[in-house]
Curated annotation (Swiss-Prot):
Species lineage: Eukaryota, Metazoa, Chordata, Craniata, Vertebrata
Similarity annotation: Belongs to the apolipoprotein C2 family.
Keywords assigned: Chylomicron, HDL, LDL, Lipid degradation, Lipid metabolism, Lipid transport, Secreted, Signal, Transport, VLDL
Name of one Pfam family that matches: Apo-CII
A biological process from GO: negative regulation of cholesterol transport
GO molecular function: lipase inhibitor activity; lipid binding; lipoprotein lipase activator activity; phospholipase activator activity; phospholipase binding
The keyword Ion transport appears for this protein: no
Gene transcribed to yield this protein: APOC2
Domain of life: Eukaryota
Protein name in UniProt: Apolipoprotein C-II
GO CC term, one of those recorded: chylomicron
Region (Lipoprotein lipase cofactor): 78-100
Location of this chain's protein in the cell: Secreted
């Protein structure tokens, strides 16, 4: 799982690095101009979409049904245990505050 995260992280860094190299050759606008803000916003949005698409593609390539079922089962068991322990903790806290 960590290798997938690292791959996606380096992909995002690579895309951002190419943008920085390409942005150096562009004409410099006034820093306060709305056109520059729009360009930056559009650029960030396009990078986010690219990274999201790459992550989704990577997930679809490495999707394993058995692992997904195990993760869902582990999540349901752990959330049930946490709700039980949260109930016990709440009970103890109310008892402590009430002073019985």
């Amino acid at each position: 799982m960590s290798s997938q995260f690292l791959l996606a992280f380096f992909l995002v860094l690579l895309v951002l690095g190419y943008e920085v190299q390409g942005a150096q050759g562009l004409q410099q606008d006034d820093p306060g101009s709305p056109a520059l803000f729009g360009k930056v916003q559009e650029s960030i949005s396009s990078y986010w979409d690219t990274a999201k698409a790459a992550a989704q593609e990577l997930y679809q390539k490495t999707y394993l049904t058995s692992v997904d079922e195990k993760l869902r089962d582990m999540y349901s068991k752990s959330s049930a245990a946490m709700s039980t322990y949260a109930g016990i903790f709440t009970d103890q806290l109310f008892t402590l505050l009430k002073g019985e």
